[in-house]
Amino acid sequence: MRPLTARQQEVLDLLKRHLETTGMPPTRAEISRELGFKSANAAEEHLKALSRKGAIEIIPGASRGIRILDNSSNDEFDGLPLVGRVRAGEPILAEQHIEATYRVDADMFKPQADFLLKVYGLSMKNVGILDGDLLAVHSTKDVRNGQIVVARIEDEVTVKRLEKKGSIIYLHAENEEFDPIVVNLEEQKNFEIEGIAVGIIRNNAWM
């Protein structure tokens, strides 16, 4: 089975839950209602995408004509955790920071992604990182000037372009409306580089 987008995984999970609780798959209208789609046509498009990726089989002519395919032999990855708010002094991948796990193959990114981070705001819009994107992050402390990094200051996580001059860190936005964040490592002890950006998922599509 080809990797699913976050939204496609939501639809597949709903199909499985419905089968477990009722013994039958949901209709397109039920999928739309439960997942907040505007119409049954939107549900149909997601089902077609799942079918193309080998997750389900659509049986023509039946409102509940959906069969989930057994892909257990092809399950070679566990997905990527989505990190939410973090607490100062705790590892970013601590269990209490994980909001969800998305069925995304870490090896699709180079270097390999270790977690996802939801982007808020438009401070990096000039390099195509937009509000609502899921940023794929490779965990590393080995970073170079000019790389887009995920940095943590106290309990705030930010995505910026790195510039280091001695003990001074400049975290540059890619939007002229935002000033750089300046960190003096001799004064700010609760500062960490958590990793580098290796890709994004936007609007439930691979970018």
From Swiss-Prot:
UniProt catalytic activity: Hydrolysis of Ala-|-Gly bond in repressor LexA
Residue ranges of DNA binding: 28-48
Cited InterPro entries: LexA, LexA-like, LexA/Signal_pep-like_sf, LexA_DNA-bd_dom, LexA_repressor, Peptidase_S24_LexA, Peptidase_S24_S26A/B/C, WH-like_DNA-bd_sf
Reported function: Represses a number of genes involved in the response to DNA damage (SOS response), including recA and lexA. In the presence of single-stranded DNA, RecA interacts with LexA causing an autocatalytic cleavage which disrupts the DNA-binding part of LexA, leading to derepression of the SOS regulon and eventually DNA repair.
Entry keyword Cytoplasm: no
Family that this chain belongs to: Belongs to the peptidase S24 family.
Residues at the active site: 123, 160
Xref: Pfam families: LexA_DNA_bind, Peptidase_S24
GO cellular component annotations of the record: protein-DNA complex
Entry's EC annotation: 3.4.21.88
Gene Ontology biological process terms in this record: DNA repair; DNA replication; negative regulation of DNA-templated transcription; proteolysis; SOS response
Superkingdom, natural source: Bacteria
Protein name: LexA repressor
Site (Cleavage): 88-89
Biological source species: Haemophilus influenzae (strain ATCC 51907 / DSM 11121 / KW20 / Rd)
HAMAP family, per database record: LexA
Record keywords: Autocatalytic cleavage, DNA damage, DNA repair, DNA replication, DNA-binding, Hydrolase, Repressor, SOS response, Transcription, Transcription regulation
Gene designation per UniProt: lexA
GO molecular function: DNA-binding transcription repressor activity; sequence-specific DNA binding; serine-type endopeptidase activity
Quaternary state and interactors: Homodimer.
